[in-house]
Amino acid sequence: MKVLVLDNYDSFTYNLVQYLGELGAEVEVVRNDHATVDELLIRGYHAVVVSPGPCTPDESGISLEAVRAFPEAGIPTLGVCLGHQALAQAFGGRVVRHAPVHGKICEIEHDGKTIFERLPSPLTVGRYHSLVVEEGTLPDDLEISATTVGDPASVADGGARGGVIQAIRHRTLPAEGIQFHPESVLTPEGMALLKNFLAAGTRAAVGGIA
């Protein structure tokens, strides 16, 4: 399966590439300012991962456009950290500042669907971020699929059910975002989560969507 990793100039990008490769994917890395979305759409990718990055969605090159265009073309798309924030913003959500969290282990509760299928809940994950998606601004098209446990936050700081939003999912398009890092050693089930994501790409390829 051919997977695009859209690189937002992040040190974690090649950890993602390594994990995806170990899962059998043929991975192509393209930096966020080295191609247009139209150029990438015709390359026959079966799935897309939009990487973490050190900036904001507004500074993430083609990421904002990509997280809409690929799902709208039927290509499963996963945003990680900055990619997750870009997904929320691209569909009308708001990204706000949050107290910096770097290399923090925490537990999240999830809904057990799609990328979280067969994964334990609570799930231990590693967080590295200073921006979050603000719950009250999410459009109806997006649903919250995971939040932190025992980490209260106000709605203004991205609070959701007493915690910070850690994953979102589009209700009708194959697009998901995760605030945490599946490629971090602090996320023991990260490989399993990415395997679930690639399974969606495989189904899309078999169905002739991608």
Give residue ranges: language-model regions.
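A short beta-strand-loop structural module common to alpha/beta enzyme folds
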Residues: E26-A35
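Acyltransferase
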Residues: V185-A210
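Short amphipathic alpha-helix with an adjacent loop that forms part of the alpha/beta core around
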Residues: T36-G44, T137-D140
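Two-component/phosphorelay signaling modules centered on CheY-like receiver
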Residues: V17-E26
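Cysteine-nucleophile active-site neighborhood
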Residues: I42-R118, P122-T124, L194-N196
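Conserved hydrophobic/aromatic beta-strand scaffold that supports enzyme active sites
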Residues: I105-E107, I165-A167, G177
